[in-house]
Amino acid sequence: MQRAALASIVVLLASLAPAFGEAVTPRPIPRLERVEGRFRLLVDGEPFLVLGAQSHNSSASDPAALARFFEGVKALGANTAEAPVYWELLEPEPGRYDFRLVDALVAGARQAGVRLVVLWFASWKNGEMHYAPAWVKRDVWTYRRVVGPGGDEREILSPTCAAARDADARAFAALMRHLKATDEADRTVILVQVENETGLMGTDRDYSEEATRLFRSAVPDELTRYLSAHRGALAPSLDEAWARGGRRNSGTWSEVLGEMAAEAFSAWHVARYVDAVAAAGKEAYALPMYANAWLINPGDERAGRWPSGGPTVHVLDVWKAAAPHVDLLAPDFYQPKVQEIAALYARPDNPLFVPEIALSPHYAAFAFPILARFDGLGVAPFGVEPDGKGEAAAAMEEYARVYRVLKPLLPLVARHQGTGRLHAILQDVEPRQVLRLGSRVALVASFPRPHDLRGPLGGGLVVELAPDDLVVAGCGIDFVARDLEAPLVDPHQWATRQPVLSIDEGTFEGERWVPGRRLNGDERWVRLPEEGAILRVRLRLP
């Protein structure tokens, strides 16, 4: 028995020898980098684009449900999972932490071979406080609630409550310390969402005595200095409200920002609260952190219909001034104006990241412009646990098609973001679209499937490797190439008069092209079928 035990110890020591004998270079911490006016998420020191999959809200509270979630992650072909950690379960009693669910989540991501975005469900979830621990919910004196304009208490922690903020920050710091201790070597976790869809649902601001005193006080100097320093570059609605008040550099919230005062006041205090939580977490483990936004829906007439003070387009600048420890602000998309709103979040001071998008066949192809038009960091549909039926099953299939096309292209896309040589196509109500590639070449796109507000859209991207060498990829698009310097021809001759030398199917391994079939004869068309394809198109340009 002693000899067997000794042999086991020898084997163990031998396995540990490299750790003591050789210096092991640790993986660099994930971080955001700004290069030549564009942002990159670096993972293991290399640009990383998120093809994500987010769980339903409750899946990470139960191992069986979590296993079903990772089945969905695999079925989608995602490279990143997104799932919550719940304050109420992490800290069931003040100062007592239970990390078992956190460990199960990280282990599940490792087993699935994907990276992980941790979503911190704590003081806020959809504009309310559902995930605060029971001991916070019971103690309304210490952890003050928002008061509505009629004097009624709401199920929302007041953003001016220091006790709630500090309790949240302590728990979040404990989570980040645990992640550092257990995941620093593997770097499974690459991003952290601080809270979820913050703001005040059902009221434009907190009308409690303390909050009203602050509302009637002067706007903080940090915000007025920010407004002055960014004059001409502010979000239009905020700039207009400030202009109507004479662009004052001091005064109360109402004096400085007029009709936007209540929402801006809420944004300032919510953002300061979230920033304090993020700062505590970063002190423990400095992963990139973001805050996500419940967007303003068509027909919403005032703050409170959406969570007032969350990082919506109206108040992005307030958040930028108030929350320097929050690396980016991210829209959640459950409405069709994806590109219009994405353009407002893709700012010189904010990269686009879409941590939630509807699990609907209609939304899958938006991944192409998110990555290729707006230089986005990634995208993730919400609720990917498979049920095998209905619209959800159809949506999973459509997202899987899009991800199959995009996944081998990610290194190429990451390298070409921000260069002007990466382009996106997305089907809209027009039957044709023209994509101009410099002054010489145009691609005329048409879509075999009719435009449908609920059904799948044709979408794709084009990478200009050279003026006469294109990567064309996507789902459900037909292209005709035109030489803009050649004589005009009858439209009926377009297909046969293309300046195309060759068309190859294929894929990429890293940035190395691996060719498949050469398409010629009856198949010499630049066609991306519904199931998706990657083509290498070489042009004849004298």
What do the PLM-derived regions correspond to, one by one?
Residues A445-P456, V462, D468-P542:
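C-terminal beta-sandwich/jelly-roll accessory domains of carbohydrate-active enzymes
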Residues G45, A81, A109, L175, ...:
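Conserved, mostly hydrophobic/aromatic
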Residues V114, A276-L287, V313-P411:
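Catalytic-core region of carbohydrate-active enzymes that cleave or remodel glycosidic bonds
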Residues G52-D62, P84-V102, P149-R170, S254-A271, ...:
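The substrate-binding groove and active-site-proximal loops of carbohydrate-active enzymes
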